[in-house]
Amino acid sequence: MRKRQNYMNVKLGICNFCVPGTGVFAPQIVSEMGLDGMSIEFGSYEHGWALSQKKIMDLYLDAQQKYGIEYPNIGCSDGDNVPFYTPQGDPMYDAVQHWVTKAVDAAAYMKIPMVFFSNFNASLADTEEKLENTAKRYRYLCDYAADKGIEISCENPLSVEKQLQLVEMVDRENFSLFYDSDN
C-alpha cells in the first residue's frame, strides 16, 4: 500500500487495541493502512503486563523498523481494572507500583517519549482522598521518569476544575493531561 501524501506535516496514528489483530502484528496492519504510527498498550494484570517483557518489547521494536511506523506513547489502560490510586498498606500497592514503574522502564528501553495512564472505572479519583493518592503516585512516576526523558500523562473523565487541581497537585514539568475525543 502506498503511504498517503502528507501536506501539513500531520501524522496520523491509532491505538493498538483499535486495530483488528492487536498485539505485535498490529504494526504491519497499521503500516498497510497508511498510518504513521500507533499507541502501544502495556497490557493487563491478568496477562502479566506483556510489554514489561523484553521479548515483547523487542518484537515491537523489530516491527517498528520493518514497517517504518512510530510509537508515540505507551497506553496503560489497566487502570480501568486496577486502582491507580491504591495507597500504601493496601494489598495491591506493590502490584500497582510494579505496573507503573515497568511501564516507564518499557518506554525508556523502547525510546518512547510518553506513558499515559487511564484513570477511569477502578481508577476514577472521585473523592479528595483518591485524588491525593492519584497525585502522589503521579509525582512519584514523574520523578522516576524525568531522568529518562519520559513524559507522564493522565487520561480521565474528571471535570476541568478537578483536572486542573490534579495538575497543580502533581506539579511536575513532565506531567500532562491526555485527551481522547472518544471518551
Where are these regions (language model features)?
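Short, Lys/Arg-enriched N-terminal segments with co-localized hydrophobic residues
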Residues: 1-7
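Aromatic-lined carbohydrate-binding surfaces of glycoside hydrolases
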Residues: 77-82
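Short beta->alpha connector loops
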Residues: 17-22, 44, 156-161, 182-183
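Hydrophobic faces of well-ordered beta-strands that scaffold small-molecule active sites
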Residues: 10-16, 38-40, 71-76, 115-117, ...
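Structural motif corresponding to alpha-helix initiation and N-cap regions
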Residues: 23-24, 53-58, 97, 101, ...
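Catalytic domains of carbohydrate-active enzymes, especially glycoside hydrolases
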Residues: 23-44, 110-111
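Active-site acidic/histidine proton-transfer and metal-coordination neighborhood
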Residues: 3, 65-70, 83-177
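Glycine-rich, proline-tolerant flexible connector loops at the mouths of alpha/beta enzymes
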Residues: 39-64, 119-126
